[in-house]
Amino acid sequence: IGQNGKPFKMYKFRSMYMDAEERKAELMAQNKMGDSRMFKLDFDPRVIGNKILPDGRHKTGVGEFIRKTSLDEFPQFWNVLKGDMSLVGTRPILQDELEQYELHHRARIAIKPGITGMWQVSGRSDITDFEEVVRLDTEYISNWNFGLDIKILLQTVKTVLKREGSV
């Protein structure tokens, strides 16, 4: 979902199995975010190559590498060129997430979603409170200026290179 709730096709390199959305329901109890307005797992078996071994250890695969290095986001530059996304903005959301939003959450769709944003450079996977994500996004919207975008872009490069807070 893009700016003002307009649906768009977001391009990404596939890092998850084709049935990832169908398998989401069975994993909802493990959601670090606590509800279904946003979904994150410590170890996601829907990621290509990820397996839980018989002894309980986790084995990661190529999909995890693609996600940790943020390579899966690279095709979103096409969305920026098409005008659906911005380099910096709020996190893009799914339709089923939007349907569960309260009024104050909808501020996140007032601007174009971005490839990166305040949430991504402020802890990414370490943030497990949806209201904190909303707070960071609304703070970005309220304080937006060109300098803030440059700061976030530079911080994004640092975050990606150091793989800080990556999924």
Question: What would you call each of these model-derived segments?
Answer:
Residues 1-167:
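Conserved small/aromatic sequence motifs within transmembrane helices
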